[in-house]
A protein has these predicted regions:
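Cell-envelope/extracellular polymer assembly enzymes that use nucleotide-activated donors
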Residues: 1-3, 21, 31, 184
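Short, well-formed alpha-helical segments that are part of the catalytic scaffolds
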Residues: 11-24
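A conserved acidic beta->alpha catalytic loop
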Residues: 21, 28, 36-45, 61-63, ...
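Glycine-rich, basic loop-to-helix element that forms the pyrophosphate-binding segment
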Residues: 60-76, 97
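Conserved nucleotide-sugar donor-binding catalytic segment
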Residues: 74, 134-225
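C-terminal subregions of glycosyltransferases and related glycan-biosynthesis enzymes
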Residues: 207-307
Length: 307
C-alpha cells in the first residue's frame, strides 16, 4: 500500500480537485492521510464530503508545511509514501508509474517522475531537465545534484515517492524553513539513498496568480540562506569525491539564487558579498559578473533592470 500524504492549509478552492486526482488513479492500493494544519477556511469541510474509508483526516494546530508532512509520515501505514500538495494534481498513471519504479529498481529508496506547470488559465509550461544519466524512459538518477544544478529541480514535492524508512532516517522535513525546505530534503536524501526516475510528466504543479511582493521575497531570502547553510554542512561531511563535486555545482547555483533574491529586495550590497563568497567557493567570475554589476547600482535602478 502507498500512503499519500497531503498537508492542508486554507485550500478550500483546490483540495477537492486534488483529492479527485488521487481517486482517479489506475493504481488503487492507497490510503490518503490529509493533515489539516489549522485551516481557518472551509478546507476541512471539503475533505469531509468525500465518503471514502481510505481518507484519514488528521488535525493539528498550525505549525507549517514541514510539520504537517512529518505528521503525515508518522501516521502513514504504508511502506511507501507519496507526497502531494493540497492545490496540485496527479495524472491517472502517476501512482502506477511510481510503483513500477519501486518494483523495477529494488536498489532505490526514492522514486520520482517529471512534472509540468499549469497556470490558472490552463496554460502548460514544461520543465527543462538536462543531463539525465540514462537514455530510456526511466532509470537510476545517479547524478541528482548535477541535474539539479543545470535544470528545473528534477524532483518537486508532488512528484516524489519514498520509502518511509528512508525519509525517517534523515529526520523528515526540516522545521523552521519556509521556502526550499523540500529541496533541502531531496538533497539530504540524495547523499544517503539511490533515486529511480521516470521522464513521464505525471504531476501538475498549479501556479496561482500572486505577485512576489517585498515581504515574500524577504521571507525567501531568509529561507534560502538557511538552506544554503545546510547544504554547505552536507558538503563538508561528504566523503565521495564524485558526489561532492556535483554537490559543489548545486551549491554554487544556490549562491546565485540567494544573491538574486537580495537584489529583488533592494539589498545590493548583500548580493555582492554573496557573489564573492560564491566565487571563493568555486563559482566563476563570468557567471556572477551580472550580479556584481546589479549589486553596485542604486536599489531602485537595479530592481527595475532585474525585474
Amino acid at each position: 500500500m502507498i500512503s499519500v500524504v497531503i498537508p492542508l492549509y486554507n485550500k478550500e478552492k483546490q483540495i477537492a480537485y486534488t483529492l479527485q486526482s488521487v481517486f482517479e488513479q489506475t493504481f488503487q492500493d492507497f490510503e490518503i492521510v490529509v493533515v489539516d494544519d489549522g485551516s481557518t477556511d472551509n478546507s476541512v469541510e471539503k475533505v469531509e464530503k468525500f465518503d471514502d474509508s481510505r481518507i484519514r483526516l488528521i488535525h493539528q494546530t498550525n505549525a507549517g508545511v514541514s510539520a504537517a508532512r512529518n505528521r503525515g509520515i508518522e501516521e502513514a501505514r504504508g511502506e511507501l509514501i507519496a507526497f502531494l500538495d493540497a492545490d496540485d494534481e496527479w495524472m491517472p498513471e502517476y501512482l502506477a508509474t511510481q510503483y513500477g519504479l519501486y518494483q523495477k529498481y529494488p536498489e532505490c529508496s526514492v522514486y520520482a517522475c517529471n512534472y509540468e506547470f499549469r497556470d490558472s488559465e490552463g496554460k502548460v509550461t514544461p520543465t527543462i531537465i538536462r543531463k539525465l544519466p540514462f537514455e530510456g524512459e526511466d532509470g537510476v538518477l545517479s547524478n541528482y545534484f548535477e541535474v539539479a544544478s543545470c535544470s528545473h529541480p528534477p524532483i518537486c514535492s508532488i512528484s516524489i515517492m519514498v520509502k518511509k524508512t528512508a525519509i525517517q532516517a534523515i529526520g523528515g522535513f526540516p522545521l523552521g524553513i519556509k521556502s526550499g525546505e523540500d529541496l533541502l530534503t531531496w538533497a539530504r536524501l540524495a547523499v544517503n539513498e539511490k533515486f529511480a526516475y521516470s521522464r513521464k510528466v505525471l504531476s501538475v504543479f498549479i501556479e496561482t496568480k500572486s505577485d512576489m511582493n517585498i515581504s515574500k521575497a524577504q521571507m525567501r531570502a531568509g529561507s534560502e540562506g538557511q538552506v544554503l547553510v545546510e547544504l554547505l554542512l552536507l558538503y563538508d561531511r561528504e566523503k565521495n569525491h564524485v558526489l561532492k563535486s556535483q554537490l559543489k555545482k548545486y551549491i554554487i547555483r544556490w549562491y546565485k539564487i540567494y544573491a538574486v533574491i537580495q537584489i529583488e529586495i533592494g539589498q545590493g550590497h548583500k548580493a555582492i558579498k554573496i557573489a564573492y563568497k560564491a566565487m571563493v567557493f568555486g563559482g566563476t567570475v563570468k557567471s556572477f559578473f551580472p550580479i556584481l554589476i546589479l549589486g553596485m547600482l542604486p536599489n531602485k535602478l537595479s530592481r527595475i533592470l532585474f525585474l
